[in-house]
UniProtKB/Swiss-Prot annotation:
Substrate binds at I8, C9, T10, G11, E12, Y13, N93, A94, V95, H115, P116, G117, Y118. Its EC number is 2.4.1.309. Binds 1 Mn(2+) ion per subunit. Belongs to the glycosyltransferase 6 family. It catalyses: alpha-L-Fuc-(1->2)-beta-D-Gal-(1->3)-alpha-D-GalNAc-(1->3)-alpha-D-GalNAc-di-trans,octa-cis-undecaprenyl diphosphate + UDP-alpha-D-galactose = alpha-L-Fuc-(1->2)-[alpha-D-Gal-(1->3)]-beta-D-Gal-(1->3)-alpha-D-GalNAc-(1->3)-alpha-D-GalNAc-di-trans,octa-cis-undecaprenyl diphosphate + UDP + H(+). It comes from Escherichia coli. GO terms for molecular function: hexosyltransferase activity. Gene3D superfamilies: Spore Coat Polysaccharide Biosynthesis Protein SpsA, Chain A. O86:H2 and O86:B7 subtypes share the same O unit, but the O units are polymerized from different terminal sugars in different glycosidic linkages. The gene is wbnI. This is O-antigen biosynthesis glycosyltransferase WbnI. Pfam families: Glyco_transf_6.
Length: 234
């Protein structure tokens, strides 16, 4: 079985890829080979040294479309993946620092990571989309988990369904000139509210800026340390 990896790196985010790739090859589900689908506006030659990387060219958009449109990117390739495989998305700044075996996911259709910034907060304080005219609206009386958008996926058939629905909702809102509060993460949280995934702890998305955590399995590198990052959201 091949494990499919979705990775978006438009613009300067390509600088993160080498370190992510090497860590993923070494520590993420090492029992199986991996195929990487890299969505980028960079030249293909930048990734040509890796034989298991397929480059999918996408247009570089301004913030927040460069993250909001991720579901439409994924639809470009999802149909050609084997339905009995597994597919996972990682943020560009992810680095796997401890081995994560296949047994972590094998019994689950989908996985979701609790957002470390909202782990101990009550639901009314979550940045769920509260506007009633948004397709991803979740009211203040709802209770649940707030998921981080940096690492998700699962069985390819289940992940495909998530992608299709979240893309449909995203496009419906864009037609109304409505941008969800936390962009793609708002749609992910809506979907997971009604389709509960296997919940992974914050150790699977530990922010580097929170300081060292010897138990962390995946580190999210501090993008703000990069000199180019200040221009991303302009």
């Amino acid at each position: 079985m091949v494990i499919n990896i979705f990775y978006i790196c438009t613009g300067e985010y390509k600088r993160f890829f080498d370190k992510f790739y090497l860590s993923c090859e070494d520590k993420f589900i090492p029992e199986f080979g991996k195929k990487y689908y890299v969505f980028t506006d960079s030249d293909r030659i930048y990734f040509s040294k890796y034989l298991n990387v397929e480059v999918i060219n996408v247009e570089k958009n301004c913030w927040p479309l460069n993250t909001l449109l991720r579901f439409s990117y994924f639809l470009k390739v999802i149909d050609k993946l084997q339905t009995n495989s597994y597919t996972f998305f990682f943020n560009a700044n992810a680095v796997i620092v401890k081995e994560i075996p296949f047994s972590t996911f094998m019994e689950s259709d989908l996985i979701g990571v609790i957002h470390p910034g909202y782990k101990n907060r009550i639901s009314i304080l979550y940045p769920w989309e509260r506007r009633k005219n948004a397709t991803c609206y979740l009211g203040y009386l709802k209770k649940g988990i707030y998921y981080q958008g940096c690492f998700n996926g699962g069985k390819t058939a289940s992940f495909k369904r998530l992608i299709q629905i979240c893309n449909m909702m995203t496009m419906a809102d864009l037609k109304k000139n409505l941008i969800a509060k936390v962009h793609d993460e708002s749609y992910l949280n809506y979907y997971y509210y009604y389709n509960k995934p296997l919940l992974l702890s914050e150790l699977y998305s530990w922010p580097e800026k929170y300081g060292e955590n010897k138990d962390a399995k995946i580190i999210m590198r501090d993008k703000e340390r990069e000199s180019w990052y200040g221009n991303i959201k302009k």
